């Protein structure tokens, strides 16, 4: 009995000691403070970050690194500009039909994701459509420079069909061992606008987590990615812009009802209201259907919620360019992926698990 009593007292003392140590550790742990910042110089859009850190110094260090990472990805995925010492997607396009280009792993992995998503989306996400997308890009640029909408022009079907002859994704030759990319068709080009930003956001957020950031909400042009939860244990929340009442400034009317709970999740939207120009009173947006070579007309907006921003970015474009039934089959076949479709007759349709993420 004495032995058992001694063991009990020893265990009790050890327990008290552990509790004291834990209490001491808890009291020493600094309270996290909310900070925020904005960047304007990456991916031709606005980047906003809200994060909780132990000090402003820690926050600034994290944001300097995150900003630098975004700049790097922006340069790597750029199809319009050259940068000193940087081999980017433009370099690949410039060497189409000429020679393989040795590229950074961050380009390889992004292109490999895009190739996988080409299969997943029934070919609706096709980064090899650069020749067609460039025609539409030039038409939008000309419209922006025009004094009135009356001067705006549509591309001709003849030029679009001619460009479409150079969009075969099988001519994008990726050699993972040699770390090279080769475009076998000299007239083809890559356009990674449907994957680059989302993939960059995912990689940048993963890097921030690896540096110790535990609680943040990152928005790059509306591509939302949540890191962890808030210090009080509550989840971050995201909203879906109302495609029928969109605005440059968020208001109650510009957002659809129903905030989305987000913890280590991404929320990405593609919409016909984001980038467009007007011809004869009709809006022509930037999301081009590979089958028609014209802006897809199935939806006004498609939003995807999942754990990976790159995947979400690819899916929003792919789903936007195909009928609801086909898109729903894709979403329901993917674990941890939910979607919302906003139709031209102002219906909101969601996948089976969407409502489980709504903030109560």
Protein language model annotation of sequence segments:
Residues 2-11, 18-360:
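Mature catalytic core of soluble alpha/beta enzymes
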């Amino acid at each position: 009995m004495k032995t058992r009593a001694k063991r009990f007292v020893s265990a009790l003392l050890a327990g008290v000691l552990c509790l004291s140590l834990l209490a001491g550790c808890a009291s020493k742990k600094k309270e996290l403070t909310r900070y925020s910042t904005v960047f304007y110089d990456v991916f031709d859009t606005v980047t906003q970050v809200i994060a909780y850190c132990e000090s402003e110094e820690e926050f600034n260090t994290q944001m300097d690194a995150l900003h630098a990472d975004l700049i790097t990805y922006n340069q790597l995925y750029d199809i319009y500009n050259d940068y000193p010492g940087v081999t980017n997607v433009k370099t690949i396009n410039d060497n189409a039909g000429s020679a393989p280009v040795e590229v950074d792993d961050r380009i390889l992995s992004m292109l490999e994701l895009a190739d996988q998503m080409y299969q997943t989306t029934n070919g609706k996400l096709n980064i090899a459509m650069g020749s067609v997308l460039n025609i539409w890009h030039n038409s939008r640029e000309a419209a922006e420079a025009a004094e009135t909408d009356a001067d705006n022009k549509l591309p001709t079907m003849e030029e679009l069909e001619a460009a479409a002859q150079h969009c075969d994704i099988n001519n994008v030759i990726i050699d993972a061992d040699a770390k090279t990319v080769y475009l076998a068709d000299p007239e083809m080009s890559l356009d990674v606008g449907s994957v680059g930003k989302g993939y960059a956001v995912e990689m940048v957020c993963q890097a921030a987590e690896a540096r110790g950031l535990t609680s943040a909400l990152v928005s790059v042009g509306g591509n939302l990615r949540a890191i962890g939860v808030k210090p009080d244990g509550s989840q971050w929340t995201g909203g879906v812009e109302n495609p029928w009442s969109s605005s440059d400034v968020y208001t109650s009317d510009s957002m659809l009802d129903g905030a989305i709970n987000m913890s280590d999740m991404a929320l990405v939207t593609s919409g016909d209201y984001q980038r467009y120009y007007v011809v004869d009173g009709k809006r022509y947006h930037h999301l081009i259907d590979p089958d028609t070579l014209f802006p897809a007309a199935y939806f006004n907006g498609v939003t995807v919620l999942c754990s990976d921003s790159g995947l979400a970015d690819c899916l929003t474009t792919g789903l936007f360019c195909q009928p609801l039934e086909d898109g729903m089959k894709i979403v329901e076949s993917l674990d941890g992926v939910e979607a919302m479709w906003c139709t031209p007759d102002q219906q909101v349709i969601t996948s089976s698990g969407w409502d489980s993420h709504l903030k109560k």
